[in-house]
C-alpha cells in the first residue's frame, strides 16, 4: 500500500498540517520541520497524488504552452523546438509539468484554455507567438491567471505580459547595414503578417528603405508562409524575377534556408551574386555555407526569461509588464 501524508507525519514526528504545508510549497514552516518532512518523504518513497491535491488545494502544478498555430506550420521550425526546450527545462527545475496546447484555430485554442483554467489544471500560460489580432489576449485577461507572451503586446491588460526583442529596430539596423554596404535593390522574404513579429520586421525593412529614399517594390516583398514548402516556393518565385534583387532580407530561419536552397538550384552564388541576411541562430549559421549575416535570435534566453517571469507572477512577486531581450547583429 502506498504511503500517505499520515505516514509521513508519523515518521517525521510532525503534524499532518505541517506535511501538507511542505507538499503545497508554503513558506510558513521552519527549516527544521521542512527538512524532517523531506527526509520522511524520501525514506517512504512518497509520490503525491496530483489529482487529489488539485481538488483540495489551488490546483495542479502545471503551466500551459500555446503555439497559437497548428503543428503543421510549426514542424521543422527551429525557433519553436528551441524555445520549448528552454521552457520545459526551467519548469522542471520548479517542479511544474508542461501542457503543450495545439489546436486548429484561435477559437479552439481559447476554448481549451478556458476549460483548463476552470478545472484548475494550470497556473499560468506561455504563448510562443503574439497574434496581431489581440482579441485572444482580451479573452484570457478576464481570468486571474498570468499569461506571458513571447512577442509584442500592444494593448493594456491586467494579466498579460510580454518578453520580446526589438524586431522593428533590429530590422531597420539590418537593412541599414545592407544599404551602407552598397546595396540598393533589396528584397524581403517574410512570414505571414498575422503575428506582430512579422509585421514589425517588414515595417522595419520598409522604414529603412524610406529613410534612404529607396522606393519600395511590392513585387520584391514576398510572403513565404509558415512551412518549408511554401517558403521554398516563394524563394524560387523571388529569385526568378528580372531584374534579380542584389540582396534579400529574410525574416526567419525558414526563409533563410529557402533562399539558400533556391539560390543553389539557380546557380546564384552567395554572397557574390546575392547578399543574404536575416534572423538566424547559431545552429543555422553552422549549417549554411557561407554563414548568413544578420540578427542572432536569443531563442534560449527568450524561453528562459518568459518562464522565469511566469513563475515570478505565479508566486505573486512584483514583475515588469514588458521585458526586452537584447540581440546581436553579425555581418559576414
From Swiss-Prot:
Listed InterPro entries: Cro/C1-type_HTH, HTH_LacI, Lambda_DNA-bd_dom_sf, Peripla_BP/Lac1_sug-bd_dom, Peripla_BP_I
GO aspect biological process, one term: DNA damage response
Pfam families on file: LacI (PF00356), Peripla_BP_1 (PF00532)
GO molecular function: DNA-binding transcription factor activity; transcription cis-regulatory region binding
Keyword check for Transcription regulation: yes
DNA-binding region: 5-24
Domain HTH lacI-type: 1-57
Keyword flag Coiled coil: no
Keywords in alphabetical order: DNA-binding, Transcription, Transcription regulation
Name by which UniProt lists this protein: Uncharacterized HTH-type transcriptional regulator YcjW
Gene from which this protein is expressed: ycjW
Amino acid at each position: 500500500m502506498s504511503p500517505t501524508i499520515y505516514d509521513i507525519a508519523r515518521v517525521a514526528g510532525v503534524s499532518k498540517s505541517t506535511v501538507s504545508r511542505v507538499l503545497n510549497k508554503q513558506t510558513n514552516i521552519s527549516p527544521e520541520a521542512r527538512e524532517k518532512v523531506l527526509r520522511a518523504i524520501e525514506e517512504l518513497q512518497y509520490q503525491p497524488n496530483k489529482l487529489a491535491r488539485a481538488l483540495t488545494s489551488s490546483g495542479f502544478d502545471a503551466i500551459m504552452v500555446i503555439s497559437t498555430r497548428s503543428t503543421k506550420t510549426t514542424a521543422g521550425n527551429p525557433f519553436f523546438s528551441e524555445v520549448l526546450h528552454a521552457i520545459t527545462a526551467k519548469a522542471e527545475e520548479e517542479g511544474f509539468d508542461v501542457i503543450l496546447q495545439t489546436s486548429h484555430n484561435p477559437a479552439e485554442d481559447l476554448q481549451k484554455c478556458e476549460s483548463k483554467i476552470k478545472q484548475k489544471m494550470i497556473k499560468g500560460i506561455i504563448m510562443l507567438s503574439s497574434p496581431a489580432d489581440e482579441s485572444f489576449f482580451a479573452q484570457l485577461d478576464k481570468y486571474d491567471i498570468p499569461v506571458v507572451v513571447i512577442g509584442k503586446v500592444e494593448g493594456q491588460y491586467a494579466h498579460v505580459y510580454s518578453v520580446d526583442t526589438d524586431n522593428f529596430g533590429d530590422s531597420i539596423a539590418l537593412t541599414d547595414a545592407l544599404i551602407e554596404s552598397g546595396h540598393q535593390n533589396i528584397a524581403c522574404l517574410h512570414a505571414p503578417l498575422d503575428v506582430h513579429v512579422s509585421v514589425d520586421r517588414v515595417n522595419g525593412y520598409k522604414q529603412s528603405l524610406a529613410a534612404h529614399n529607396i522606393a519600395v517594390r511590392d513585387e520584391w516583398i514576398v510572403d513565404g508562409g509558415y512551412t518549408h514548402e511554401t517558403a521554398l516556393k516563394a524563394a524560387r518565385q523571388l529569385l526568378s524575377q528580372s531584374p534579380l534583387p542584389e540582396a534579400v532580407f529574410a525574416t526567419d530561419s525558414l526563409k533563410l534556408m529557402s533562399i539558400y536552397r533556391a539560390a543553389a538550384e539557380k546557380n546564384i552564388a552567395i554572397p557574390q551574386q546575392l547578399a543574404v541576411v536575416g534572423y538566424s541562430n547559431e545552429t543555422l549559421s553552422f549549417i549554411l555555407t557561407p554563414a548568413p549575416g544578420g540578427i542572432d535570435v536569443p531563442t534560449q534566453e527568450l524561453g528562459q526569461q518568459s518562464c522565469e517571469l511566469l513563475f515570478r507572477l505565479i508566486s505573486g512577486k512584483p514583475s515588469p509588464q514588458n521585458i526586452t531581450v537584447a540581440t546581436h547583429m553579425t555581418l559576414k
